[in-house]
């Protein structure tokens, strides 16, 4: 955990974000599963760090497939150790080259209506 021993981290004001990672061979690996979240919670507690854990539903946790964010968000919200989620969302779905208004130029995103629908579904699960 890069937070442990960090001078930049004020112990009660920082939190961890589990985004997944690339292994030594460059393969994207998720870390939003129950075992990974539990292990991270243990590390935070052991080091007397803020226990708030945010789960990134995109990036390596989705294998860079923005449509998997929905499944990841639903799974995250059901985990009692998860304090929050992070979504890649924009006005228009996907990723666009050339500066199309309302569309991400970097990572592909859920569109506005998909995000709204997902947030309403997540609210119903709380």
Q: What are the residue ranges of the model-derived segments?
A:
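Conserved, mostly hydrophobic/aromatic
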Residues: 55, 111
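Structural preference for beta-strand elements that scaffold enzyme active sites
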Residues: 13-17, 52-54, 82-86
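Active-site-proximal loop/turn and secondary-structure-junction residues that shape catalytic pockets
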Residues: 20-22, 59-61, 89-93
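Structured alpha-helical segments in the cores of large, soluble enzyme domains
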Residues: 6-7, 33-48, 76
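Substrate-binding cleft of secreted/luminal carbohydrate-active enzymes
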Residues: 75-95
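Short glycine/threonine-rich loop-to-helix capping motif typified by GTGT followed
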Residues: 63-73, 95-100
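Gly-rich Lys/Arg/Thr-decorated short loops/hinges at beta-loop-alpha junctions or inter-strand turns
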Residues: 11-26
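Single conserved hydrophobic/aromatic residue that forms the stacking wall/gate
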Residues: 1-5, 9-10
